[in-house]
Structures are given as structure tokens and as C-alpha cells.
Curated annotation (Swiss-Prot):
AcpA and AcpB regulate cap gene expression and capsule synthesis. Residues 165-270, 283-394 form the PRD domain. This is Capsule synthesis positive regulator AcpA. AcpA has a larger effect on cap gene expression than does AcpB. Induction: Transcriptionally regulated by AtxA. Transcription is also positively controlled by carbonic acid and CO(2).
Amino acid sequence: MEKDISRKIDLLNILIEEKRWFTLFELEKNLNCSSKTIRKDISIINDLLPKTIFIHSKKGKGVKLSLPQNQSISEAISNLLKKSLTFLAIQQLLEERSNTVTSLADKLYLPISSTNIVLKRVSKYIKKFGLSLEKKPLRIVGDEFQIILMFSERYLESYPDTEWPFTEYKEEMLIDYINYIEEKLEIVFYSNDKRRMAFIMTILFKRIKQGHKVKFSEWIIKETMESIYYKKIFEGKNVIKVNKNRSLNIEEQVLLVIMVKLSRYVSKDENNLKQEELVLYKEGESTTYTYVKNFISILEQELKIDLNNNEEFVYGMIEYCREAFHILKFIPILKAPEKDTCKYIKKHYEETFYLVKRAYNKWGAEMKLTDIPDEEIAKVTMRIVAIGKQHNINRKKVLLITGEGKSWEEYMKSRINKRYGDQLKFVGGHAKILNGNTDNIDNIDIDFIITTVPLNFSWKSIVYVSPILQERDFYEIGIFASK
């Protein structure tokens, strides 16, 4: 990403941390630039912000972000990312409109020398996904599944909300396909996971049309086709098609099933499902639950705490292991960049992280899992940390919606409860809200929603917060908690 765009995003992230005036000296020091550059950045950012959000700059006071509690800065950040030459180059590579450096330079209105600098940034970005860039012809090479993941993640960063970037495929058609998957599996995807599925599907269709092929090992294909997910979605009539004359082949179907398993969703009958799974776990007859029980036992030995009698923790680990085992066993090629949330946990809970890592590696050896990434260790660490911070005497009913995964969601709950534990009670995900069906939202038994992702509806009681909670976020939550 270009330095000027990165700096503007950093400026926004600094201003959103706290609801106060920041001095120009503070900002100069944090951003390593002059006050003149900061004022210029503020002017550009204000043009990108919605009318209700504004960055004030006053002599003698400094700089302050005016942000209503029911809005976020995601629109401004996505607008900045769309202007990034790195993204524009990746966009051209997806469309396969430029097969030489010269033709790409013409598309970007840049000299050859500047285009080569942009391509170096592209190479650095895609390397995190195990991919590389070839110049003759100009193209991205590597595992096709990773290529699709890379394109979808980059597009989601630039189009996180409601704007649809793919003109040749109607969004309504993709959403219909995803609704069909939800209906067959009796689930509701989280809103940002539903959007990710739509992007994955569209990019898959585009790549198929361009002649690219998805490949998996025979073992992955066999395991996936035997799963209940595959049988419910694809056995029977072929509903999901690239076009009216082209159905998905087996490996393309497998890719979509894998993405469903890696997505976050809620069951339409979540409470009954939870109780059924806990009963099966306690009976210990299924190997699936035996694996989870062994993991929890190893964690207890390393951490010297009781975990097996905590039903919330056990059920959370059942959910987690189902996804993690699939990632580590079936898709060892995933090489996504480390998230800020992972870095945060490693820094602030170093000892717990180390003990969980030791336990995870022991369990991994038993399960023949190799190269367990820190991202997965951090997810389990978050669940351990959350146990000691949760309280049950709460009042206001709150729904928390995040885009960072279930483990981080539990950790966020624990941090909010630590501050407002005697005032709030977190409730389970409501399928209607996640599905965007909000006609009767006022009749749902919640007092307000806390979310880290943009929602596709308006409501009087929504608090937008950062994934790593800041003082500004606690202040906004406190307003609703005190009402």
C-alpha cells in the first residue's frame, strides 16, 4: 500500500481511539510527518467521509473526530483502499486485462518505472498467500484456491459494505445461491461471512470462465464428499451454476463446502444444538468429541485449571475444534497474513499463550497436525483468558456481532463485562438479524447491538466499535449501559 494512503488510514485509527482533542505535535510524532501534511490529509479524508462524520481542526485545540455512535469510519477507509495503486493493479490482474507490464502501466496511467514499484508491492502482498508474480506474461501463479482467497480478501477490504464491485454477475443471483445453502443446512451466516461467500463464489466463477481450474487431493475430495455439508448442498439437483449451461464440477463444489465450513454461522435452533452436542461430548462415544476432550485435558494439565466442567468453554471448544481441525488437517496450504488481534493476544497474554501453545503442539502431535500457526493458538488463548473475566450478574441484553471469529468475540465479551459486568448480559446470535430480516427488530428481546462490522440496516441502538476495544468504544458502550 502507498505510504500516503497508509498514513491517512493510520490517522483515522488514531483519532477513533479516544473521544478527545489530539494535538498536532502528538499526531506528527505518531505519523512521522509534518503538520502541513496532516492538515492536507484531513482535508482529503473529510471529502471521503459521510456528511455526519467530520474531522475538526482548531488552532489551540488540535484535531478531533466527530463520530456518531451508530456509525463507523469503514466507508472512508474502504474509499482510501480503492484508490491504492496496489489494489488497482490486483484488480487488473483479476480481470486479466493486462498481460504485460507496459499494458498495465497504460491502464494505471503510470510510467514503467512506477508500475514496477507497484508490482513489487503486489508481489509482497500475495507472497503471504504462498503466491508469486510472473511478468511474461503478467499473472499471479500458485494454488488456485489460494488465488481465489487472496482476491476475495483484497476485494473485501476495499468493498466491506453494500457496494457490489462485479458488474458481470448480479449480486442477487449470488445471494440466492447462499440463501439456498442456508436453507439446506438450516443455518444463517454472519453478514460479513455471507458477503465473503458471495465474493468467493463470484471470483470462482470468473476464474472458471477464464479457464483456470481448482485442484484438491483425492483425500480432501473424499473426506468433503462424505460430509453432511456436501450431501445436503449438492446431492440431488444442481442449483448452483456458473451459468445456465455450466454446473460446478466436483472440485469446485468441494471448494464451496470448505468455505462454508470455514465461515461463521448460527444454527436456526442453536440452544437445542448446544445441548445435543454437550450430551454427545459427555457420552464420549464419538471420536469427534473424544478429540475435543483430549485437547481440553491437555490444556488442563498445562494451565493447572479446571476447564472440563465449564459448559460454555466446552461447547466453544467443540465449535472451535470442528473448524480448526478442518483448517489444519484438510487445508495446510492456508497462509493468510497474521491479524492484529493475534499480535495483541501474544503481547498481552504472553505466559498463557506459551502454555496453550505447548498444549496445542502436544495435541497436534497426537492428531498428526503439523505447523500449527500462532493464529490458532491465539484463538484458544482468548477462550482461556475469557473464562476468568466473565460475570453472570448482568442486566441490559446485548447482541455482539464481530468479523474476527468466535474466539475473539468471546474475548471482547469478557473485556466489556470486566468494565460493565453488572450492567450487561450478552445474548446469542439472532438468525433474523444476521439474515438482514429486521422488519420486527423492535420486538426482539435485546436492548442494543455492539458490532465491529457494518450492518445492512439502521436501528436506534447500534454501537460501532473497533475489534481491539479503545476508550472511545467503552465510552459509547457505557452510554447505552447506563440508560
